[in-house]
Amino acid sequence: MAENESNVVVDQGQTKLSDLWTKEDYWAIWLGFVILIAGMWLFLANPSPEFAQKVDKANGVMAAEAARAPFKTLAYYKAQDDKGKLQGMDTPSGKAIGAFLTTPGAWASDPLEAFVLSKEAADERNAAAKAKFESAKVKSDAALAAAQAAEAAAAGAAFADAALNTEAQAKIAEWRAEHAKMKAAEKKTKTKPFNIATSLPMLMVALGLFFAVGMKFMGHDVPKFLVGFIGVFFVAVLALMMGHQSTMKYWGIGAEAWAIIIGMLVANTVGTPSFIKPALQVEYYIKTGLVLLGAEVLFDKIIAIGIPGIFVAWVVTPIVLICTFIFGQKILKMPSKTLNIVISSDMSVCGTSAAIATAAACRAKKEELTLAIGLSLVFTAIMMIAMPAFIKAVGMPQVLGGAWMGGTIDATGAVAAAGAFLGEKALYVAATIKMIQNVLIGVVAFGVAVYWCARVECREGHSVGWIEIWHRFPKFVLGFLAASVLFSVISGSLGSDMSQIMVNQGVLKGLSSPLRNWFFCLAFTSIGLATNFRELAHYFKGGKPLILYVAGQSFNLVLTLAMAYVMFYIVFPEITAKI
């Protein structure tokens, strides 16, 4: 019995006041909020007055251009781009933090370049990228000249000629596409030398001590944890290095997948060294990261995209989750209900984040969680490449394509990468819908906790009370929701422009997001190092988990595309026109 209890994602227990400082879920909340509060102090306490001045100037130009022309002019876009360059993390302290949290860099054939890049090597990269940049600049300049001529013609007719206006819009859109390619090429000519060989050991010590505080209060052996953390961190760094290799990056095989692959190879060949095992704290790392993820779910962004996005995320997702679970139970006859629900939520909601919350709510075995996450990572890598290529091949509109990808690709980072492949609109829509979908993490965790208490593990003649649901409910989700509410209030009070600068490009991208990425990588590394192939083998009997995922994702793809088309192009076309 003791062995079974230790093999589930969350152990049962009675609620006590001491849980606040002895339980993992609460420590995930406390540590997450320590980071968020530090971020608010660093980036929100003393904003530069230049930010407000530059924003006001850009908004003035944009308002004047919007009043002058019935479409977004070149001057409008220039002002918009100038505003977009403002970043709260672009300060001495912000740059120092960014350098300290840096992960291994990009490399092609020499892995050492992920850690140390000399000035000569940086200059060589810049020179190699210069020709492509110059070619892109020629095309961008030509597109700009054509756009200027078309806009001038439309202006000459006082913007009263619909044909000239349409032509100007088309030429400006072409310039924006070429300009984006040019900026991407230009970025590759600005590679700077770096050396993170010294900062990585310091970061390892800092993160180890950070998590050790909670380990001490939870009754674990801190010295053994810190020694083991060295091994976990080392494997995580290797995974990040492999995830940034150019070929791996192209095919979407990121650090998360490599963390599990390398960890599993170690665990199932030489075996995970015993000194590392005290630091294999999968849930501790990932729950802390999920609390930080909550700060990225902002209500004002949800409102900005309107009802269409909410329908795509909040109507389709529960339908897909429930139907997939029923399919697994009734048709496939899945032997494990917990594996069924974890895979169903992983596939339908938002990948690993939903999987860990659901696994905690239904007390799934750790091997089941590992299997669900593995399936998610494999299909995420496939979909983030295949979907943009298909959307482009069939000529699907960016808004529709972005909504489709945002509702179906599991990982938030993969959604952004796939959206960026299509263009600005697709990136915005895809990322926003995925963020709206992330809100369901807490809802799904609560729903699964209630269902498992009332229907799956109910005892005859025994009514389910709220206290039992509370015991089952993963408490770290409260931190996720609290972070979302807090930062939504802060974002709303600052206004959309200053929120983008100080919150998105300050607290979040300057501190919490980089740390969240580190925490997730540590968690995936721990999953790999703790996984035994033999323990996973029986779950694949008959290929049922794979069939469940493929069937559910196929249904998800069809229903999401249909809902996105209906909501964005039939019911609310006016919202689509404004995006």
UniProtKB/Swiss-Prot annotation:
Q: How does it sit in the membrane?
A: Multi-pass membrane protein
Q: What is the predominant subcellular site recorded for this chain?
A: membrane
Disulphides: none
Do you know which InterPro entries this protein is assigned to? Answer: UPF0324_pro (IPR018383)
Alphabetic keyword roster: Cell membrane, Membrane, Transmembrane, Transmembrane helix
The organism's place on the tree of life at top rank: Bacteria
Any keyword Nucleotide-binding? no
Any Pfam family the entry gives: Cons_hypoth698
Q: Where would you find this protein in the cell?
A: Cell membrane
Q: Where are the transmembrane segments?
A: 26-45, 193-215, 225-243, 250-272, 305-327, 369-391, 401-423, 436-456, 476-495, 515-534, 549-571
GO cellular-component term (any): plasma membrane
To which protein family does this belong?
Answer: Belongs to the UPF0324 family.
The protein's name: UPF0324 membrane protein DVU_2133
